[in-house]
């Protein structure tokens, strides 16, 4: 029986499939940095000066917009049912005054702007709650209650935002919910806004763009473990909140980590343009799929002379490629939607978005949209031009800069996305990973190459000496390249690890992009402390996983089969969901797992009958072999041994793999 229990313990293979849905990280309290040299080298200060050249960081217009309509600010913390802190409103109180030497002044300005948190009036009958999460929660007053636009990441912060709003605006019911797009920071807290039972009982309309549920539950399921691990770097979830660590994400302060759920839409907007009346108020929706998200719309509220740009518009250059990992976004399509939106905002006196602060006044609204439209289009067109001239992605990224009319405009600065990695994204979109150089067609794996480079350079001591010279000269990119090879050739080389960590410190402190800063500083932290001890707490995802089709989990299951151990096996397993009244046939052949929704196969090696809730408990590691055999919620017909053998083939990915070492 020991073998069978081992197999079923491995059935928690999917415990990390949705890790990426939380945007990354599992630490509710940030790690403290190890003692490190606090020397900010002159090259970093020079980089700060260069990034601010020609830019008026003292321009008061954005600060006036960020403060406009302020009603009240929250204090204290938001906790979960167990008393764990989900959100601390005072965590970024240190962001004030002049920029410290360890933060790019331009990024510090963005962090100051994002520090304006609380309840704000956008227009008559429209309010926003900012700083309760990385995204905004918007309230639009209908005839009888509040229509909620986006619901943050976590149930706890969404509930806190609603309670705070009601204290100041009155205890009105939720009469509609709008999800602008399929990223979790805009829907994950929905059950903190209104319960599924209340929404159903009162027939509250829940509006979302076409394809919303599939995109919301699928983008991160297959690659969720890898995305979640990488997102720890991008969002700096392990970093301390201080001037040497996390100061901002570029889009907002940070990501809230609590219970994530989903309120299933009752109305899908599937036309290019579609009008709806919600609680007596007219909305005009425009679908923009494949802009910032695969499923997304923007909308106007004509009666309020207001337009919501969702996340297609923001006060930063956004990502065409997100560093946590995802499919590349289409710059040409995104720019095209922004061009169309110039007509959609006709008559609007305010544009509000689901990150950052609004823009008021028709001339400023047009400028806001035009600059973003042209930034994405310029990056696209110039990357294609240089690509057709024979340049590779890295070469284009090194050469490409925005024209000064765009570069000096603060709302398309690279606080989140950057021109450099967006140019590489455009190259990848059209050309993929191969740059056409024969030497790059089948290169040596990185660790093998690293060992040979170190040997070629004269050994570890010689490489370390060269890296010190590069570091002292302020050539931190070259120092990082040398030290990457040295650390990958020998992860136990403490001197190399520390110098690489110090190099990443300098690169992070220099960066204008918050994700770049977070990536570098998390790399430095992990060189000193190692990877996290555990991945995402999966139980927080149960409410979301309930809405994920079984097929999504089976796709992830197929991708977790260890091909080497599966070779030569031929197994058929029936999965019967008694509560869903559906069954799936899984067949393993040629070390490939296929699955079909079909009646149980008569010749199956085993049939496992269970309920969806118990299946989810298995996936999240809350149930194992003992519960499978004794819970009374399952039945096994056929070979128990074959069923255990099948589950033993599935790799468990805890989401704590090393990134800066091997």
Stretches with model-predicted labels:
Residues 450-478, 482:
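Alpha-helical segment of the N-proximal tetratricopeptide repeat
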Residues 36-48, 52, 306, 316, ...:
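Divalent-metal (often Zn2+) His-rich catalytic cores of metallo-beta-lactamase-fold enzymes
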Residues 144-145, 155-206, 270:
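Active-site metal-binding motif and surrounding structural segment of the metallo-beta-lactamase
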Residues 121, 145-147, 153-155, 170, 214-288, 333-345, ...:
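Metallo-beta-lactamase
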Residues 112-172, 296-311:
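Conserved beta-strand hairpin/beta-sheet module of binuclear metal-dependent hydrolase folds
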Residues 22-25:
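C-terminal motif of bacterial Sec signal peptides marking the signal peptidase cleavage site
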Residues 28, 475-481, 488, 492, ...:
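Feature captures hydrophobic
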